[in-house]
Amino acid sequence: MELKLLNSNGQEGAVVNASDVVFGRDYNEALIHQVVVAYQANARQGNRAQKDREQVKHTTKKPWRQKGTGRARAGMSSSPLWRGGGRIFPNSPDENFSHKVNKKMHRAGLCSIFSQLAREGRLSVVEDIVLEAPKTKLLADKFKAMGLDSVLVITDTVDENLYLASRNLPHVAVVEPRYADPLSLIYFKKVLVTKAAVAQIEELLS
């Protein structure tokens, strides 16, 4: 698989030969969907809480006697049938939302995403991205010259200047290959990978 190599002005020059195992896979929408949903589910935390009839603060006194009133029998006002009573199946902060995806499926899903990005022209390779200082304007001007506004940068090692400069740009993220997640790969309009990172991605996913 040949990937486009961009220069500092965003113009296409030479090409980089990449592994077909990682960058030349068929598009598998069902697998990609499963991997993305699992990633989102595993990022969820239990922050919902409701009370059952035991936790609701109510008296345990019987509202009225069992027989003779003509009304429906009732044991206590915390009953789920009553207004202000507890929930029958309350949401709990201990709820587990995680989805399990096998390692082979996860790797195959990432390969399918990388391959589709390459086919759509959303994946490009750069020699390296070097900044002289941790200035947001320097990085913003560099991406503007390359015609990029929403970009995920994957580098072999995250340079401190590059990382600090990218933090204040709303649609820019800088990660190492091992931290490239399926949701970010799909979310950003463009994915820039350094030449050294291409080899790392192939090693991780082959």
From Swiss-Prot:
Record GO biological process: translation
Biased-composition ranges for Basic residues?
58-70
In Pfam terms, one family for this protein is Ribosomal_L4
A cellular component annotation (GO) from this entry: ribosome
Any one Gene Ontology molecular-function term assigned to this protein's record: structural constituent of ribosome
- Residue ranges for the region (Disordered) are 45-85
Swiss-Prot/TrEMBL keywords: Ribonucleoprotein, Ribosomal protein, RNA-binding, rRNA-binding
Mind telling me which InterPro entries this protein's record contains?
A: Ribosomal_uL4, Ribosomal_uL4-like, Ribosomal_uL4_dom_sf
Quaternary organization: Part of the 50S ribosomal subunit.
* Function per UniProt: One of the primary rRNA binding proteins, this protein initially binds near the 5'-end of the 23S rRNA. It is important during the early stages of 50S assembly. It makes multiple contacts with different domains of the 23S rRNA in the assembled 50S subunit and ribosome.
Family to which the UniProt record says this protein belongs: Belongs to the universal ribosomal protein uL4 family.
Q: What is this protein called?
A: Large ribosomal subunit protein uL4
**What organism does the record attribute this protein to?**
Burkholderia mallei (strain ATCC 23344)
**Gene that encodes the chain:** rplD
